[in-house]
Each structure stands twice: as C-alpha cells, then as structure tokens.
C-alpha cells in the first residue's frame, strides 16, 4: 500500500465548486500545502482524479517523509513537531519511527489530528522554480497530476 503525498500547485481563483470542495476535504486549502494519505482510504483515487488539474501527487519515500515531518510538521499552537513531543504523546521513539509506521500503514497521519498534530504541511514554492508549466499534466511535460516517485524531488525542493 503506497503512501501518497498530495501538493496543491494552483491557487484559489476560479476554482469550480466541486473541485474546491474536494480540495477542502483533502485539507489543501491554499497554494503550496501538502497532505499525506494511504492508498487504502476509500474514495482517495477518485478524489485525486477529481483534483488532478490543481494538484500533483505521488508515492513518498520514508526518508523524505521523515525530513518533511522534521522540518514542516506542526502541532496545535503552530509549534514544531519534535522527537520529544512524539515520545511523550504518541509513545514512539521519535520522528523516524513515526515515518516508518506511516509508510507501513500502521498509523494514518490525518487521524493524528485528535492528538494535536496538524494534518497538513505548509511548503515553500520550489527552490529554482518549476521547470515546466503548471497548466499541463506531468505526463504531457507539465507539473500537475500523478508523478510517481518524482514527488520526492519536488518535496525536497519545497522544504
């Protein structure tokens, strides 16, 4: 079961209502925000297909997920997600073990919201900019839609 990272690339202007609702449900409410979801969630594939023209997504690796959690993970109060907080509140040894359990499917990141973890990540625009158009699909030489493991390079550029 892959763990998908979904990043909103396009902004909020002229978004059709059905796409806006789906982006809201995915917790992608502004540009350059990211969320992570398991493939096992019912309806996720259909939701990703619906918002394909506004987002990019792919399978995230464990090492990239750990770095994303370390640099951009937040808890309530806009405080950083730290190893100490994970040990005290989740009973895990640190962010490395949290990333491992998320990738394996034992934990779901969006369900950690009950414990005080924010279910999204605020990212920077990519360093060096996008190399191609944000109006075309990745398979057609653009930046949108499914990009497989190439999502890891984009996330590292946006941290």
From Swiss-Prot:
One of its GO terms (cellular component) is cytosolic large ribosomal subunit. SUPFAM superfamilies: Ribosomal protein L30p/L7e (SSF55129). It holds the Pfam family Ribosomal_L30. Keywords: Ribonucleoprotein, Ribosomal protein. GO terms for biological process: maturation of LSU-rRNA from tricistronic rRNA transcript (SSU-rRNA, 5.8S rRNA, LSU-rRNA); translation. GO terms for molecular function: RNA binding; structural constituent of ribosome. InterPro entries: Ribo_uL30_ferredoxin-like_sf (IPR036919), Ribosomal_uL30 (IPR039699), Ribosomal_uL30_arc (IPR005997), Ribosomal_uL30_euk_arc (IPR035808), Ribosomal_uL30_ferredoxin-like (IPR016082). The keyword Chaperone does not apply. Part of the 50S ribosomal subunit. NCBIfam families: PRK06049.1, uL30_arch. Belongs to the universal ribosomal protein uL30 family. This is Large ribosomal subunit protein uL30. It comes from Aeropyrum pernix (strain ATCC 700893 / DSM 11879 / JCM 9820 / NBRC 100138 / K1).
């Amino acid at each position: 079961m892959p763990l998908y990272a979904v990043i909103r690339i396009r902004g909020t202007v002229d978004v059709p209502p059905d796409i806006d609702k789906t982006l809201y449900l995915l917790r992608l409410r502004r540009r350059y925000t990211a969320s992570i979801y398991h493939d096992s969630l019912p309806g996720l594939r259909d939701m990703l297909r619906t918002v394909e023209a506004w987002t990019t997504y792919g399978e995230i690796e464990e090492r990239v997920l750990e770095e994303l959690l370390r640099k951009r993970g937040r808890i309530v109060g806009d405080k950083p997600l730290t190893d100490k907080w994970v040990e005290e509140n989740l009973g895990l040894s640190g962010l490395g073990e949290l990333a491992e359990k998320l990738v394996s499917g034992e934990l779901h990141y969006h369900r950690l919201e009950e414990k005080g973890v924010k279910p999204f990540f605020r990212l920077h625009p990519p360093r060096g900019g996008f190399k191609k158009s944000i109006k075309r699909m990745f398979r057609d030489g653009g930046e949108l839609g499914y990009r497989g493991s190439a999502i890891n390079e984009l996330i590292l550029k946006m941290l």
